[in-house]
Amino acid sequence: MRKGLTVLAMAIVSLGAPSCIELKQPQEQVQTEEFKWVVDTFDDIKVLQYKVPGFENLSLDQKKLIYYLNQAALSGRDIIFDQNFKYNLPIRRTLEAIYTNYRGDRTTAEWKAFEKYLKKVWFANGIHHHYSSDKFTPEFSEAYFDTLVASVPAEKLPHDFGSAEQLTAIIKPVIFDPALYPVRVNQAAGADLLKSSAMNYYDGVSQREAEAFYARMAKPGDPQPISYGLNSQLVKQNGKLTERVWKTDGMYAPALEKIVYWLEKAAEVASPVQKETIEALISFYNTGDLKEYDRFNILWVQDTASMVDFVNGFTEVYGDPLGYKASWEAMVNFKDMDATRRTEIISANAQWFEDHSPIQEKYRKKEVKGVSAKVINAAILGGDCYPATPIGINLPNADWIRKDYGSKSVTIQNITQAYAESSKGNGFIEEFIFRPEDRERITLYGTIGDNMHTDLHECLGHGSGQLAPGVKGDELKQYGSVLEEARADLFSLYYMADPKMEELGLLPDAEVAKAQYASYISNGMMTQLARVELGKDIEQTHMRNRKMISEWAYELGRRENVIEKVVSDGKTSIVVNDFDKLRTLFGKMLREVQRIKSEGDFVAGRDLVERYGVKVDRKLHEEVLERYGKLGIQPYSGFVNPIYTPVMEGGEIVDIIYEYPKSYTEQMLDYSSRYSFLPSVN
């Protein structure tokens, strides 16, 4: 919700404080040189950087607020590594110690393989792929790893397990044995989702035990339920289940104390409204009280006027197969005032869209409250938003807060710009889009359509509809996130082709919707398979969502050939033959997905996801991988951050300026040096 849309249709195109300086330098220097969008490429990853347009025009207090919030965003980096897997931190630190201290030959194939492995670990915030969640397979030998570790002075290695020998006895099997911790998040039907997942939100606890534990906590009929379990690790100690709460005197305390320090600095330069919001977040971090988290979210969602805004906290539950526990993430941003006008039009007409939605009337909101939307430029990415980041966000996640106070939706303009600019001329459209008219539409309207899809998905899709009386919202369990993303996507797809979009001046004509439909269906049924290892099922939430929608629409429209698989010169393409009928199908599908969510119909939701969103046609998969590989395109992208530095005069900050890191490796090592506050074992 909510972190919606991590490159959605764009996947089709590409599929401690810093030192201060005394001399004020003109900010324009950052923009005068030709901008380098691509910083690094390795394996299936392309690392980009993003512009920060308009930063120089902010007031000094706004710049200082961004700077302090940036420091808070970077201070939690270790948390997401540890949440993803309990051995990520000692492994990362061992690899970094090798990289910075090894004095041997750095030109060999095995060294290059080691370097690639380290870059992948940085990118994924751990040893499991950030998207598929499969464990990485090192392309260097255990013997070579032993040689590398032996070359590092003992004092440079993590000491949490004792000697270097004791350290490697633990981490070496974890790295090299494919049977150990093979997947970070397992969603396979019939498995114990906790015991078969490597994520670190539970320790020694079975799925049945966890579900029963939180079922006992829930208060039936509570109109304002807290998000039980959101900010804790559930463990079994002496045979008894207990929560280790993430707070400044609990688990992750050293990092959370640093985050709070910088939030306190931010509160000093914030407006009165934002100061109250930040202080509520500080209270939540200090107490771990989820009622304080709700208070923070209510204050945050009601603040729609601030130029500078942020996300900081335990937010999204995609990393927990049961959907209780949230990863730590952060993002600091400020408004793009010109682009925000389009989202203001959408939010101003939210009631019209709700009233005309094809869902059952009883599941429509009678009064849409507090829908706010804006277009932003990211200033920093952190935690689970870094290096891979969403292009749109809709928060808060609690259904009762959304119903009573509304939601805040953002489209991240400078991130979508970086994706688009870095993907120009890569040959993708020519290879996978069969019809010339579809190619032309996507070339002309693809970016407009992607941005509008994101706006509708985040601003209206997630905020639409309501639960039936007595439904809590967690009944769909491991399928809840997929179905929620599908609900928002279907809402967006349905309205993309509505005449209201042209009437409101949001889209120039119906060709934009056709471009979006053609690219979305092709991506969902086919081209996103470039992101999946051959022989694997689809595991990632957004990919399951897109495949489910596309395959379901294909089957529903099969009799009338609404969508067609075309084979020409041995190459498969997906073609939409009837855009109007496809829109009608999207409406029917939205009606059913909303019913499933509103009623908490686990069986129907499970059957939809498992039937259409998981399994992969091996022959088609092989074809996609072969064709995609010939283009030399990396299917995943992420980012390095700008580096912000205070300009000092007489001991006072008089400006904040920014520059870009020299390399991806430089930034990762810098962050590990200056923002690593947790022990290796937590």
Regions found by a protein language model. Give the residues of each.
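An active-site-proximal "capping" alpha-helix that borders the catalytic cofactor pocket
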Residues: S59, S271, S481-D498
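C-terminal motif of bacterial Sec signal peptides marking the signal peptidase cleavage site
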Residues: G16-S19
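Catalytic Zn2+-binding segment of zinc metalloproteases
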Residues: C459-V471, Y495, P499
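Post-HEXXH active-site segment of zinc metalloproteases
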Residues: G465-A486
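Long, well-structured alpha-helical subdomains associated
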Residues: I80, L493-E599
